[in-house]
Amino acid sequence: MKERKFKNIKVALVGNPNVGKTSILNYLVKGSLKIGNWPGVTVEKKEGHVFFQDYYITFIDLPGIYTLEETVSEDEKIALDFLLKEDYDLILNIIETPRMERDLYLTSQLLDIGKPIILVLNMIDEAKDLGIEIDVERLSELLKTKVIKTNGRTGEGIEEIFPAIVEVYEKNIKP
């Protein structure tokens, strides 16, 4: 019997604090989240792993960060150091759709890193309740990246993330 080989994909979950990164991660890894600490600090490190098709996907849930410029907290420094110095394949940028204008500031900085990125519009239900409509195709075209609508509380749209990761990884789609 031939041993199955999996391709490894390492995904950084990035976004402002409290945008639902951990909720989405819990859906992605179906609760098999490993929580530890970043080396040398007491800040939690959340990591999850999933097999999807021929891929072994590792998700790293980075501490919330508002900007890649000045960092003040230990959490922000950890996120920034990871994004600029560590080896990972793509960014899953989670934003809070009702506060999209605020969150897109970080997105614009992440696009400048040059890594493949998928934009996840979370809390889409709240945006809809506020009368906010998002043209996903147009936003994707403007940012030159894949855009997915989700609801981290119900899991709606999260199943679209796996094929998007594989597509962006395989095609090496960069902004």
Regions found by a protein language model. Give the residues of each.
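Conserved G1/Walker A P-loop phosphate-binding module
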Residues: 1-68
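Alpha-helical scaffold segments in soluble metabolic enzymes
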Residues: 23, 27, 78, 160, ...
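Signal for well-folded cores of large energy- and translation-related assemblies
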Residues: 29, 67, 83-84, 111, ...
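Helical mechanochemical/support elements of P-loop NTPase systems and associated helical scaffolds
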Residues: 39, 43, 75, 87, ...
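Conserved nucleotide-binding/hydrolysis micro-motifs of P-loop NTPases
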Residues: 40, 64-66, 97-100, 123-128, ...
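Conserved C-terminal guanine-recognition region of P-loop GTPase G domains, centered on the G4
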Residues: 51, 78-147
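Short glycine-rich substrate-engagement loop in P-loop NTPases that contacts/grips substrate
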Residues: 68-77
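Canonical P-loop GTPase G-domain recognition
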Residues: 127-175
